[in-house]
């Protein structure tokens, strides 16, 4: 490991963390920005300390998974089990469902306007529809979380508030901090290279730390002798990422994060995962990062497998096995389901046993867990044995801190919503997932940033977005909590 650290180049360091320098409007970033609350009636709940956001890339099929509908297309070997009166589930797809399904609350009435993976995944990450005119100034909503929680950081916090895993491998990679300062971009940890670069948390030698300190000192001296005004916005962005990386690399807690037992890796399904990015590793690292209590409070896990649109983009051979099994970036439901289930069930099981910060509470009690898809899947099977994209209705999952367990919000007939499940006539969208996360963390979702580069106010949750529906209610999904 000493050689790995000593010889780590700038390019390798950026690759390790999956940092996308160039996605922030660093030259025009200000700290702090001018922010106004748009409503005096908003009182954020502030009922969780952390959030784990799981992006299930590709959009797993609701008719087989979280909104099961038996039709003439349905396979006969799914082994359907009853979780509650409104929730049945396939044990063939989710073998460990008993560890998480009874605690989960499902919202089945979601709507998505964009049915293209790149723009829909952008919507998921930005919390708003894609608007090319102001693309560069829009931050990831994880960056907004980091910006808002900055005042709560402690002197001992070295990990950034916003940490993601394998977003670099998604159809829409990390979009950065936009108009916000680059310090809020967060770090995206590349599970395909982090262990190669740093081993498994071993070798905390003085020699290794000395080499790293010497290189950091040289970098600092180079900055000091740079010509006045020579360090621009982009250089400052690199500097901010280097500072994050250096603090993490010199923190003993980072070594512990990477120290994964073979038993844990087996439970999380790592050994069976053939993907470039293994979802079990991402969830294990998310567990350890959260348990380290080193400043990271908003964790994003991207289920990307071999890249592309994601493992669940099943336009063909949804039930394919053997010679008919999908190749490359996709997996059949018989593979993608158990792969996700092994990691997710183990994560929930571990968080429910690990102590939280408050006496008598588990880490799961203090952590809201969301599993989100960019859109749904057509209830009709196509001629290739797959399901195409579907926006009229789909399901997302919520559990953990603050969320009332075992609820089903909204109903569908597979094709359309028959009951939206909340007090508005409009269907909930990813925008409302974002405002729900904001209120849970104690953030006023009605705020807006007024001093933007374009001059257009940036609303934390839009109500009339370009590229989206005519109107979106400004609200969290309160039904998750009451």
Where are these regions (language model features)?
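Ligand-binding pockets and gating/stacking loops
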Residues: 1-482
